[in-house]
Regions:
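Short glycine/serine-rich loop/turn segments
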Residues: 15, 46-192, 222-225, 259-261, ...
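Short connector loops at secondary-structure junctions
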Residues: 290-312, 389-393
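Short helix-loop capping/hinge segments that flank enzyme active sites or metal/cofactor-binding pockets
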Residues: 49-69, 250-266, 315-413, 430, ...
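Short, well-ordered alpha-helical
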Residues: 1-75, 105-107, 222-233, 239-242, ...
Length: 641
């Protein structure tokens, strides 16, 4: 499985259509896969995810790997430990393939960071996530293109939901504290959550059974660390078994509200929803009713009040729910503390704290790109200057306690009490109004489309994460006019997460709405093997492979010479070697195999980032013996890995 995923990355991600979703590879992936093979052959599997390949966003700490969060300032920052979710997956035997692309510090969506950005596997003319908030763009592309079985993304505004919608994925944004965010780079601690990406609800449930667990360490997980708002333990809100949840029939008798503003039925606010999205919504609404749910159109005060989008509305400050100065304390004092604390906890002597960072390199604008269109935008380089003047511990930040309590009160008043008053079990709506053009970073006309309400950020904007409202997004269908997917989002009361998962699962199972990305079809020469189930005694000599490759430039072509040495007793049943996903013929002499491949030289010249060199060719080798033992290796030649 690891070999198959890496081959797809080599073929579609680094070269070919160059999706650029997985810029960093785990050098130990084959070692970890071999250990999983041994466990499973010998009846010692660590769980259902043992051996399953996955990706994680570049903001997750993976011990020994860099944790740049897409920023040139942190390109060489080394993680000293695993993030909580990475540790849970490692303990369950899952195999990390690599880290996925993102804009610097997740402070945006499709802006280009140190590794560039990911592209759409569905339509090259459109963005793989919302431009202003879709920072888990690499996770969305990688999961949709089957570069791994699932991906770990994040969300602060809509960075998990938007790429899920644009890639026909399932995304779960949990209630506060349900999934520990310890070990993830913070952006805005009051909003940040882990967001898993999967290709189906059953896959999501398998994953949640592993990563939803109590974490006794609260450092780096703001909501679990703060003392003013009591949160339930993960074990108190999760079911005994996610995979044991009954999905069929979950929608029966449910009363669901669809906000008029998201289906083109609100005359007071102009969210321009694409006609093909509305067509898919009509089909989804009909299916929800066939599943015996009652779907009613509603106004949506939680968003209208938060954004003051119409006359007569009052936001949290207007109503005295949060202090006037809370927003500044939240975006300055709290973020400076959180970024600094992350670096101090990471303990890399090269960048020990925020004051030691080169602020100008945190989020530099790539040459030739348009400026962002955020209101009240600022340069995050200022965080460094403030850190130099002193970092306020979060317990001493003025107005923070009152602000947090106000966020909770706002959710109860504007959303949960409103749900009760309307006799609603949940709300449901198209995840986005439209999809931005791919050239929105350089074309003014495209930018105007990409920055419209409902397109710049997934529907709901900041409300869901700021107020701690859980959501589950599932595929709603593929737009007939542009071939891009769009999701359907279910949202409900805080800690009603399990019911939302069941509702989404019931909808998903009623019809096939997910389309495979047409730009990344199945490759003809697969590297999966028929599994040999015989157990192997512990004293059996290990199978090892040593892979070497050299590149010689010759005009418009590069010649790659490959050498593979196999060590271990047994009879080989299969030796498969690929260069950039294409098979090459190997000649055997004893335990050594040799071969050559010719690739276009321009493949080693393509720029994916203004801050890095060009990608090299990926050479992969997978060997399987007659007794079932297998080993693999990869290396990169002709450029960076």
């Amino acid at each position: 499985m690891v070999g198959a995923c890496l081959r797809r990355i080599a073929h579609y991600d680094r070269h070919g259509i160059a999706l650029n979703a997985v810029p960093l590879l785990n050098p130990k992936m084959f070692e970890e896969a071999a250990a999983s093979d041994w466990r499973r052959r010998n009846g010692a599997a660590l769980g259902p995810l043992d051996g399953i390949p996955y990706t994680a966003k570049d903001s997750y700490k993976v011990s020994g790997l860099t944790v740049a969060a897409g920023s040139p300032a942190f390109e060489h920052l080394i993680a000293n430990e695993d993030a909580f979710t990475i540790g849970r997956l490692r303990a369950g035997g899952a195999v990390l393939i690599g880290l996925t692309n993102m804009p610097p510090m997740a402070n945006g969506g499709m802006q280009r960071g140190v590794y560039g950005r990911a592209e759409s596997p569905y339509n090259a003319d459109y963005l793989t996530a919302a431009f202003a908030s879709g920072s888990s763009n690499g996770s969305g592309t990688a999961t949709a293109a089957s570069f791994a079985a699932f991906g770990l993304g994040e969300e602060t505004w809509s960075s998990g939901r938007a790429p899920a919608s644009n890639n026909a994925l399932v995304a779960y944004t949990p209630s506060r504290g349900v999934i520990s965010v310890r070990g993830n780079w913070p952006l805005v601690p009051t909003m940040d959550v882990v967001v898993p990406h999967t290709r189906s609800v059953p896959d999501m449930l398998e994953l949640l059974d592993v990563i939803v667990a109590d974490d006794p360490n609260t450092r780096g997980d703001f909501w679990r660390a703060q003392p003013w708002v009591a949160l339930p333990k993960s074990s108190d809100v999760r079911p005994p078994s996610y995979t044991g949840l009954e999905l069929e029939g979950a929608l029966r008798g449910m009363r669901l509200g669809v906000p008029r503003m998201y289906i083109g039925r609100d005359t007071d606010i102009a969210i321009q929803t694409r006609a093909s999205v509305l067509e898919l919504w009509q089909q989804a609404a009909a299916d929800l009713r066939r599943l015996a749910a009652d779907v009613v159109e509603v106004d949506f005060p939680v968003v209208s009040n938060y954004e003051r989008d119409r006359p007569g509305t009052k936001n949290m400050v207007d109503r005295g729910l949060i202090p006037k100065g809370f927003a500044e304390r939240e975006i300055w004092d709290l973020c400076v503390f959180a970024w600094d604390d992350f670096l101090r906890a990471n303990a890399d002597p090269a960048i020990p704290d925020l004051a030691s960072v080169d602020g100008a390199k945190i989020f530099p604008q790539p040459p030739g790109t348009l400026p962002d269109r955020y209101e009240d935008s600022f340069d995050v380089a200022e965080y460094v200057e403030r850190a130099k003047r002193g970092v306020t511990p979060f317990l001493a930040i003025p107005e923070l306690e009152a602000g947090l309590k106000g966020l909770e009160a706002t959710r109860r008043i504007d959303f949960e009490d409103w749900l009760d008053a309307q006799r609603l079990d949940a709300v449901v709506f198209p995840a986005v109004a439209d999809v931005g053009p791919a050239d929105a970073d350089v074309n003014e006309a495209s930018a105007a489309l990409a920055w419209r309400n409902g397109t710049w950020v997934a529907n709901g904007n900041l409300v869901w994460r700021h107020l701690g409202i859980p959501t589950v997004t599932v595929p709603m269908g593929t737009m007939a006019d542009i071939g891009m997917p769009v999701g359907l989002t279910f949202a409900g009361k805080a800690y009603d997460d399990t019911r939302l998962l069941r509702l989404a699962g019931d909808f998903e199972r009623f019809g096939q709405r997910r389309s495979r990305p047409p730009r990344t079809p199945e490759l003809p020469d697969d590297v999966f093997f028929a599994r040999h189930n015989a157990s192997m005694p512990g004293e059996t000599p290990p199978l090892t492979v040593a892979l070497a490759a050299e590149t010689r430039h010759a005009g418009d072509q590069d010649e790659i010479t490959v050498t593979l040495d196999v060590a271990g007793t047994g009879i080989e049943t299969s030796v498969k070697v690929h260069v950039n996903g294409e098979p090459i013929r190997m000649q055997r002499t004893g335990a050594r195999f040799t071969g050559r491949a010719v690739v276009p030289a321009k493949g080693h010249e393509r720029i994916h980032s203004v801050w890095r060199g060009v990608y090299g060719s990926i050479v992969t080798a997978v060997v399987r013996l007659e007794d079932g033992r297998a080993a693999g290796a990869y290396m990169v030649t002709g450029g960076i890995g």
